[in-house]
């Protein structure tokens, strides 16, 4: 029996929640599927995770960087490659070029997977154009999809509108055995990071506006002013790292905040922490909140995190509008 070929689109070069979910699904699929993953040109921070023999990586110009080059490269690629399924992992439907090229060069069934409740705003005219394209493609191209999925009800409404009843809600899942609490791992993690008896707060995710780490630093600063025996671990990479590091310096928090960058041992770091902060402006579901609850970690999340993320009494919601003082 020939292997089924699946084209995967929508992953970035920075390992985040979407990348984690997609790779987790791929690694659990039977070996009679072959996956071709399209990634933006440039260095991929998680290339070591593509160890499976049934995964092929194709680099392509990102649509947001140059739509014309993207159209040319994607068209040329699909002219010479045939797939059994196309799996689109999207934060919006604004990539009209993608839908046009797929319509012209591919007959494979399309699966659209919504991972968020809004696109990441950059300000100005670009945001307006993305929103207009999103709603245009919602009306014109959704009918071409064979299957519509979302990680939460809110993510479904954002991507597909509120009038459809054919959407599959697939809550982000984790390997519970991997994230279960272990006292030995907690002691080891705290020893390796020289945390001692400090109360440890944790931030995890791509360092970007939507994750709202700057607000978390304001919260941590107020906590530190009340109790000096605290430390903040910031896990992840992104465009705002330098800005956040500078803010720590201005707030005189450099000795109390550790930027750990991209890590493969998220489960290990969760063991060493006491509180997870999730101050995101919006989330599709928040994979890390599920992982943290499994590890027995207290979680404080913004009202941008869907209610579906609450699996235990360890997760508590606070509105961002209440401000840093209330959070602290």
Which residue ranges define each predicted feature?
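Aromatic "clamp/platform" in nucleotide-sugar-dependent glycosyltransferases that forms part
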Residues: 91, 262, 281
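A conserved mid-protein helix/loop that constitutes part of the nucleotide-sugar donor-binding site
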Residues: 16-24, 199-222, 239-245
């Amino acid at each position: 029996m020939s292997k089924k070929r699946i084209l995967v689109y929508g992953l970035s070069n920075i390992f985040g929640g979407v990348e984690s979910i997609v790779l987790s699904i791929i690694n659990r699929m039977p070996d009679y599927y072959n996956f071709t993953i399209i990634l933006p040109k440039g260095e991929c921070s998680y290339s070591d995770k593509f160890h499976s023999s049934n995964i092929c990586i194709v680099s392509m110009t990102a649509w947001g960087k140059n739509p014309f080059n993207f159209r040319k490269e994607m068209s040329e690629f699909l002219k010479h490659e045939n797939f059994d399924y196309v799996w689109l992992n999207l934060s919006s439907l604004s990539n009209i070029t993608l839908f046009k090229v797929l319509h012209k060069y591919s007959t494979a069934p399309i699966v659209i997977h919504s991972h968020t409740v809004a696109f990441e705003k950059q300000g100005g005219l670009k945001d307006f154009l993305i929103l207009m394209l999103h709603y245009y493609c919602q009306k014109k191209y959704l009918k071409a999809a064979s299957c519509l999925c979302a990680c939460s009800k809110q993510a479904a409404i954002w991507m597909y509108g509120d009038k459809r009843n054919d959407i599959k809600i697939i809550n982000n899942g984790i390997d519970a055995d991997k994230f279960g609490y272990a006292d030995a791992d907690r002691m080891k993690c705290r020893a390796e990071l020289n945390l001692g008896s400090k109360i440890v707060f944790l931030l995890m995710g791509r360092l970007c506006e939507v994750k709202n780490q700057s607000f978390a630093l304001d919260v941590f600063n107020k906590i530190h002013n009340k109790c000096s025996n605290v430390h903040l671990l910031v896990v992840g990479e992104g465009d705002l790292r330098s800005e956040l590091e500078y803010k720590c310096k201005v707030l005189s928090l450099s000795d109390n905040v550790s930027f750990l960058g991209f890590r493969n041992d998220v489960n290990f770091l969760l063991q060493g922490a006491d509180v997870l902060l999730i101050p995101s402006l919006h989330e599709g579901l928040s994979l890390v909140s599920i992982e943290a609850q499994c590890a027995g970690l207290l979680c404080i999340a913004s009202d941008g995190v869907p209610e579906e993320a609450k699996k235990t009494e360890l997760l508590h919601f606070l509105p961002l509008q209440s401000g840093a003082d209330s959070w602290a």
